[in-house]
Amino acid sequence: ILSMGEEGPKCDFDRGCMACGHCVAVCPVGALENKYTPLEKQRPITKPMLDEETAYEFMRMRRSVRNFKPAVPSEEELTKLLNITRYAPTAGNSQGMYYVVIRDQERIKAIADAVADWMEEEIAAGSANKRYFMTVLRAYRDRGQDIIARKAPCLVFALARRLNNTGVSNAEQCWAYAELFAPTIGLGTTIAGFIQECGIAGYQPLIDLLEELPPKHKIVVCQYKVIVIIG
């Protein structure tokens, strides 16, 4: 794609550029210009790199959180959290992830109820998960334990276009970044597996509750973005 011209490096095959930024990143003096990653929009990394031990301990500290404070994360906190996902690797540097953030407690409860209804329908249809879903429903409906939405003050749905064959793997990469970053800004996360499975199954009552879902998109991941309980 790149070759050395009379005035420096040039792009010989513009259509083949995926805007990965590698050509710009490797320049030791920051002199390389690329129209997809222009110099004026670049942010140099000035902090010292983590040493091996610090990086190892940082990766080990990742934990799922399933008990949350009732306080709803602010828009600023959520923006910080979702912004870091832009730097996650995606197939062909496609990015293309969309997010639906839900902070309305009534709607979160309605989503959990819809998932419970879906489980009942799956049980009636003889699903392979029949026994597991029956156990979940006994906890959720008989004992009042919210093991579906975990009483989370906030839900974040990751969306990808239906024709995007790498949407699920892209979302998983993005969430991995978010999960590692969340504790640094006082947030905790966990995968909402039951809601995710229901959404991926295309259960219409759940889809109807996601008013912000763009056309021609599908749910690939659902995750809580919420405040961690301390102590």
Regions found by a protein language model. Give the residues of each.
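Short Fe-S-cluster ligation motifs
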Residues: 14-31, 53-61
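Short, conserved, surface-exposed binding loops centered on an aromatic residue
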Residues: 91-93, 144-151, 181, 213
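N-terminal, charged amphipathic alpha-helical interaction modules
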Residues: 87, 93-96, 107
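Glycine/small-residue-rich phosphate/adenosyl-binding loop
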Residues: 100-171
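Iron-sulfur cluster-binding cysteine motifs and their immediate structural context
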Residues: 1-10, 22-39
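Extended interfacial segments that mediate partner engagement and assembly in macromolecular machines
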Residues: 45-79
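C-terminal helix-cap and adjacent tail motif
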Residues: 48, 139-143, 212-231
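Small-aliphatic-rich amphipathic alpha-helix that forms the alpha element of a beta-alpha
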Residues: 62, 81, 85, 156, ...
